[in-house]
């Protein structure tokens, strides 16, 4: 499920520490458990499926935010929404993730990045990264 993968990547990129992604995630390269996890990179596929690559690049840019670089972390659930907050000083970045459609998953901040979220409505697996000062 491509939408679930992109939401999982948002959690990985917002989580403290190095973002643990493997080569091939950006295309996404199929694989299984060891030893099937070491498939050869499909370089032809790198030119296609830009949705995951573009989202990973945008998430990598957000990792430069001071709240992610220096801030603490807090996890909680609000209704059916998983929330990951990173705060430093007066800046807070909040990742709101939903796997259900129809909900307004945004809380109150300025939207920096979203996926499957339009007109204040989540559509299936979706997320919003918002900033508060």
Name each region found by the language model.
Residues 2-9, 14-21, 25-133:
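Carbohydrate-interacting/catalytic domains
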